């Protein structure tokens, strides 16, 4: 099956990761997934939240969208004096996913904050934030090693994320907005380089779905995540 943009049903959009996109954070990248563009920045603090065990570090994330990242302008969360439920859900997902990449004891008593700013949204912003956020995180950890604060990187796994869905009864990988907005089933899948699942979110938007359909969507996501892993490694110069 050929889609509106010419892709096969199991094909990712064109993916590009530009590292060191801004100069002040310890790690940064711009990830482009088709027309979705997310700026990911990693900042290091020499302290941890109160709930973190002594001798361990922490990784957390924040997610937001530029007011005109979509077709119509939306108000910033700060203008509403509270974080939107959607933003809160997404940044928790990104934070959980990236914590799975790190040995917190090896990181030591410091926090790495991952800020994900959607510059343009055309579907898949949360999974793009995971994939790009990991690259920014890895660059920040590399800087800790290069500057002598750590003997080796605390990164233990690569982490990527991608979406899949059922549109017009056809399972598809990496939905753009025109597909996502009419999907009968929507699924987000975060995996490590071993093919293990870190996060799986599946929703019946227009109808319920079967276990066989879920397995097919996960299979598509596994294929997409393997391809994203190669792109991450290329962006990082083949090493952590």
Annotate each language-model stretch with its function.
Residues 1-32:
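Short, Gly/Pro- and small/polar-rich lid/capping loops
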Residues 15-18, 24-27, 45-47, 99-101, ...:
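Glycine-rich, charged/polar anion/phosphate-binding loops
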Residues 29-31, 125-132:
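Conserved phosphate/anionic-ligand binding catalytic regions in large, soluble enzymes, centered on
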Residues 79-83, 116-125:
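A short glycine/serine-rich beta->alpha loop
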Residues 85, 106-109, 124-128, 138-142, ...:
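A structural signal for small-residue-enriched, beta-sheet-centric alpha/beta enzyme cores
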Residues 94, 98, 132-141:
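Buried hydrophobic packing segments
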């Amino acid at each position: 099956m050929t889609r509106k943009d010419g892709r096969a049903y199991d094909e990712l959009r064109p993916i590009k990761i530009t590292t060191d996109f801004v100069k002040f954070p310890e790690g940064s990248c711009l990830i482009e997934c088709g027309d979705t563009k997310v700026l990911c920045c990693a900042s290091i603090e020499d302290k941890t939240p109160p709930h973190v065990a002594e001798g361990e570090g922490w990784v957390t994330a924040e997610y937001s969208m530029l007011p005109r990242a979509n077709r119509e302008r939306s108000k910033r969360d700060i203008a509403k004096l509270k974080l939107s439920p959607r933003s809160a859900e997404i940044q928790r997902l990104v934070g959980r996913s990236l914590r799975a990449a790190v040995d917190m004891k090896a990181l030591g008593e410091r926090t790495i904050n991952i800020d994900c700013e959607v510059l343009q949204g055309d579907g898949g912003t949360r999974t793009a934030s995971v994939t790009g956020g990991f690259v920014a995180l890895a660059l920040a950890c590399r800087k800790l090693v290069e500057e002598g604060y750590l003997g080796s990187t605390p990164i233990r796994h690569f982490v990527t994320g991608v979406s899949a869905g059922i549109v017009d009864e056809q399972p598809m990988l990496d939905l753009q907005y025109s597909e996502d907005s009419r999907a009968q089933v929507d699924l987000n899948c975060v995996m490590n380089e071993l093919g293990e699942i870190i996060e799986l979110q599946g929703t019946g938007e227009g109808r319920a779905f079967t276990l066989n359909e879920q397995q097919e969507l996960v299979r598509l996501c596994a294929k997409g995540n393997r391809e994203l892993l190669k792109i991450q490694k290329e962006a990082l110069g083949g090493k952590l």
